[in-house]
Amino acid sequence: MIVLGWMLFVGLATYMGTFPEAMPPTLKWKERLPGQENKARRRIQALEEELLL
C-alpha cells in the first residue's frame, strides 16, 4: 500500500507540473487528445459502415 501511495503521489506531482524536468504533462496531454478523438471517430465510422453493410 505504501508503494502504491507513493506512486500515486509522484504521478500526481508530475502531472501537476511539480517535476517539470521529468515530463511536461500538459503538452503531452494536449497532443494526445486529438489523436484519441480521431481514433474514436474512426471506430464509430467503421462500426456504422459494418452495420450498414
Curated annotation (Swiss-Prot):
GO terms for cellular component: mitochondrial outer membrane. The keyword Transmembrane helix applies. The chain crosses the membrane at residues 7-23. GO terms for biological process: cell differentiation; sperm mitochondrial sheath assembly; spermatogenesis. Residues 1-6 are mitochondrial intermembrane. Residues 24-53 are cytoplasmic. Keywords: Differentiation, Membrane, Mitochondrion, Mitochondrion outer membrane, Spermatogenesis, Transmembrane, Transmembrane helix. Isoform Kastor and isoform Polluks are conserved only in mammals. This is Mitochondrial sheath formation-associated protein. It comes from Mus musculus.
